[in-house]
Amino acid sequence: MNNWNSITIKISREAEETISALLIEAGSAGVEINDSADYLNHEDQFGEVLPEIEQSELVEITAYYPENMPIVELKAEIEHKIANLADYFSLTGLSVTTNNLSETNWAEAWKKYFEPARITHDLTIVPSWTKDYLATGSEKLIRLDPGMAFGTGTHPTTKMSLYALEQVLRGGETLLDVGTGSGVLSVAATYLGAAEIFAYDIDEVAVRVALENIELNPGHEKIHVSANNLLEGIDKKADVIVANILADILVLMTDDAFRLVKEEGYLIMSGIIADKADMVIASAENAGFFLETRMIQGEWNCLIFKKTENREGVIGG
Ligand SMILES: C[S@@+](CC[C@H](N)C(=O)[O-])C[C@H]1O[C@@H](n2cnc3c(N)ncnc32)[C@H](O)[C@@H]1O
């Protein structure tokens, strides 16, 4: 029977996505995230709002590796990579620890975090190996292999991107999915009626993972995946652009997004930590967009901008 090792990293919340991707690139089949913000404002079974838990600025990210992988070297490699990110994230409170798990613990941890998750009225994310989950009514299943993917697709930034896509897509649109990662947003867009989707990621591994996941779903022929840095060199006009990347990177693409979005089209930006939202809003507004919708979950913001001459219904319009 195989045993497993885990590496747990405590780090500032803003580093969560990058560190998760780094742990998966190092060979983990997935990550488990423990974030106190997820428990804030939750209700108990009687509908009472639970008392606010003191909110830590740190998240705990745990990744699992088979015991035959050299855990000491892996830990050192990961610590080195994190140290190189010191200019991007606060490393205050950082800790990196390892643990040995029995097969039973591993199986439990894995199961707990990769169950089917109904995200919106119509969209449910289902692990690819769950064959017995049946869609009911108008429910559409997004099949993902979290073992290959950047997250399970149930992170607040992804969830809000899905809510936003459901809000703006009506059918027949051309969509650009910048930073496609697992491909989850592109697959969702096919279900929501988009006619043609161009998905980009800067990371070659993400491009491969996205292609593999997209193939698991009907409508995959509508999605074209390629490696690209943001929207550099792209000339495909789009009705909607969606990007779930960190704020500091999103601001680099607002001008290109404005160039490519058709009149009355939308730019959806997610992955924005609360205190950087104003910076992203200013960047998109300077490019010519108007803010139409702002969603907040815990520390995360998702913004829907519109390219329009008609300011009615836009925030501050
Ligand atoms: C948080 S993941 C989002 C994945 C997926 N779209 C979702 O919503 O769950 C961010 C993705 O953006 C990609 N990315 C980061 N910087 C990028 C850039 N400059 N150009 C294109 N993709 C980038 C990363 O490789 C990663 O796959």
Curated annotation (Swiss-Prot):
Single GO cellular component term: cytoplasm
Biological-process GO terms, alphabetical: methylation
InterPro entries xrefs: Ribosomal_L11_MeTrfase_PrmA (IPR050078), Ribosomal_PrmA_MeTrfase (IPR004498), SAM-dependent_MTases_sf (IPR029063)
Entry keywords, A to Z: Cytoplasm, Methyltransferase, S-adenosyl-L-methionine, Transferase
Broad EC category: transferase
SUPFAM superfamilies: S-adenosyl-L-methionine-dependent methyltransferases (SSF53335)
Main localisation: cytoplasm
One Gene Ontology term of the molecular function aspect: protein-lysine N-methyltransferase activity
EC number: 2.1.1.-
Binding-site residues for S-adenosyl-L-methionine, renumbered to this chain: 158, 179, 201, 244
Chemical reaction(s) catalysed: L-lysyl-[protein] + 3 S-adenosyl-L-methionine = N(6),N(6),N(6)-trimethyl-L-lysyl-[protein] + 3 S-adenosyl-L-homocysteine + 3 H(+)
Localisation per UniProt entry: Cytoplasm
NCBIfam families: prmA
Family affiliation: Belongs to the methyltransferase superfamily. PrmA family.
Physiological role: Methylates ribosomal protein L11.
Protein name (database record): Ribosomal protein L11 methyltransferase
Originating organism: Lactococcus lactis subsp. cremoris (strain MG1363)
